[in-house]
Amino acid sequence: LGYDVKAAEVSLTFKRVFRAFQEKCFDPVLERYTDGAGTKHAGLHANMFPLAFGLVPDQWVGKVAEYVAGRGMACSVYGAQLLIDGLYRAGRSRDALSLLTSRSDRSWGHMVFDIGTTMALEAWDTRYKPNQDWNHAWGAAPANLIPRWLVGVWPTSPGAETLQIAPQPADLSFFKANVPTIRGAVDVHFRQTGTTANLSVTLPGNTSATVVLPRPPENT
């Protein structure tokens, strides 16, 4: 954008904050982030947020992701967005898919099949929030998690002129997706049987894409 001086200032500030965050909040003995300076308690939220936003150094991603995955859906439907973002970012697609398809009382499956809603709720269940509404956008995280992470469609330049297609299907045997972009829809079809997988991508005529073939989940 031409703001070179401002970009340098922001970059320097980020490096300082990042370093301070690691020094104050990461416990190398626990191998995870604590809830704050001076405490040994390390909750799910203290770890899923840095995992989702790319604030975990590479050498600790595996341990932090393992801890986050082990906690399950121990957060609100609002927090579920960042929890699953973090798992997919860390390559733990099997854990992410398990949460997306769960039928526990903290799941979208519970909303649909047990409660009977046809819209995303404000909370997992009325027992957790008696005054919740039955039409709440913050409860609809799968609407963006599935196309971005499971199907793997990401714009890589302004206006979706270029894309990256990097599916993370985990154990799904197949999926068919039609992902809208400002330049037209992207069709992604995937099927796997045993050790054989087939991936088909159809792009709008005014775009190009880099295709990244699915790799085995980290938690295999």
Enumerate the predicted regions with their spans.
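Catalytic cores of carbohydrate-active enzymes
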Residues: 1-131
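Non-catalytic C-terminal accessory modules of carbohydrate-active enzymes
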Residues: 11-12, 16-19, 94-220
